[in-house]
Amino acid sequence: MLFRSGVLGIDMGADGNGGKFLLQPAGGSRNPASEETVAAKDHTIHMNGQEVFKFAIQIMGKTAKRALAKANMKPEELDMLFPHQANYRIITSAAKRLKMPMDKVWVNVDKYANTSAASIPIALCEAQKAGALKKGDNIILDGFGAGLTWAAIVLKWSK
């Protein structure tokens, strides 16, 4: 399905059962920050890295493939993959599951570390400034996050 915005296909979801693996226990409306939550450091992100890693390496490939299917495309039709920049092992795993060579995968985690929800927009901005994106390129943005949540979107680049 082609939308006017350049969106070719999208997949997203959430599984609250994994919420305990990546969360901020306090600081929101459900559990407002207090002296106690600050002292307990509950206003910071808590993560079970091993569980999040296992989730990330399986979901990034699945969600990307589902978004590609909705776009009636195959991975080899992609010009570039922009994965969430959590760590290099997760990035290479996502590329491997899509059978994408690393020269088609934008990586900047080595420069900035994990910039959380900003990682894909930063990567897109970098790629555009570097001239790595051309009008008509088929790209995919592929990520995961707290909750546990995931999403992938296939786009036709229009700039």
What kind of feature is each model-predicted range?
Residues 1-54, 58, 62, 144, ...:
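Condensing-enzyme catalytic core mediating Claisen C-C bond formation in acyl metabolism
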Residues 52, 67-71:
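Short helix-to-loop capping/linker segments positioned immediately adjacent to catalytic or ligand/cofactor-binding
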Residues 57, 61-62, 68, 79-159:
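Claisen-condensing/thiolase-fold acyl-transfer catalytic domains that form or cleave C-C bonds
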Residues 72-77:
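Short, surface-exposed connector motifs at secondary-structure boundaries
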